Design a protein with these regions (language model features):
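Sequence-level preference for short, compositionally simple segments enriched
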Residues: 1-179
Length: 179
C-alpha cells in the first residue's frame, strides 16, 4: 500500500485498466455516474463520501460493480462511509455484480434517500444469488431499508461484521487473476 494522499478523485472511465491487488481509500471523496467503483481489487473504504451524479435515468447510478474473482476472500468493504449524490430519491443502487462472485460489504454507512429500497441489483444474473456476497451492518439513513433488501443480501451480526476489519481485509491473500 502507498501512503495516504488527501483529497478525492473522479471514477475512471469505463474501459480503464484495473489491476487486482489491495487498496485503501481513507477520508476520500469519490464521485461518478455509473459503476464508478469497479474492478477486482480487494479494497477498503474508510470514512469516504461516495457521490452519485444524476443522469436523469430511471436508475441513475450504481456505486459499485465488483468483479471479484471466485478465489478472493474479500471484495469491497465500506466502513463509516456516506453514500450521497444529486439524484432524485430511490434512483441509485449500491451495487450490481460485474462477475457472479461479486463481494461488497457496507458497515456503519449513512445511506441517503436516493438509494432504492432494494439497494442491490442482480443485473439479470440469477446465478449470482448463490455466488455473490452482499452484506450490510449497522447502517442508517433513508436509503437503508433492510426489510426490503433481496434475500441474497446478508444483514450481519456484530460477530460477523468483525470479520471485516481493515486489518483482516488488507492482510488477506491476493491471488492472481483467474484466466
Amino acid at each position: 500500500l502507498k501512503e495516504k494522499e488527501p483529497g478525492g478523485f473522479t471514477g475512471p472511465t469505463e474501459f480503464a485498466k484495473r489491476i487486482p491487488g489491495r487498496q485503501l481509500y481513507e477520508d476520500c471523496y469519490i464521485c461518478g455516474e455509473i459503476d464508478f467503483i469497479f474492478g477486482s481489487a480487494t479494497a477498503y473504504f474508510k470514512n469516504c463520501e461516495l457521490y452519485a451524479l444524476n443522469r436523469n435515468e430511471k436508475i441513475n447510478s450504481y456505486y459499485t460493480a465488483p468483479s471479484t474473482y471466485s478465489n478472493q476472500k474479500y471484495g469491497y468493504v465500506f466502513d463509516h462511509c456516506r453514500l450521497t449524490g444529486n439524484c432524485p430519491d430511490r434512483t441509485v443502487m449500491l451495487s450490481r455484480p460485474w462477475r457472479i462472485y461479486a463481494k461488497a460489504v457496507f458497515l456503519n454507512c449513512e445511506m441517503s434517500g436516493q438509494i432504492t429500497e432494494t439497494g442491490f441489483s442482480d443485473w439479470n444474473k440469477e446465478e449470482s444469488h448463490d455466488t455473490c456476497y452482499y452484506a450490510e451492518y449497522n447502517c442508517h439513513g433513508e436509503g437503508y431499508v433492510p426489510q426490503k433488501r433481496p434475500p441474497y443480501v446478508h444483514q450481519l451480526t456484530e460477530a460477523e461484521a468483525e470479520e471485516y476489519t481493515m486489518e483482516k481485509v488488507l492482510n488477506a491473500p491476493v491471488y492472481p487473476a483467474e484466466p
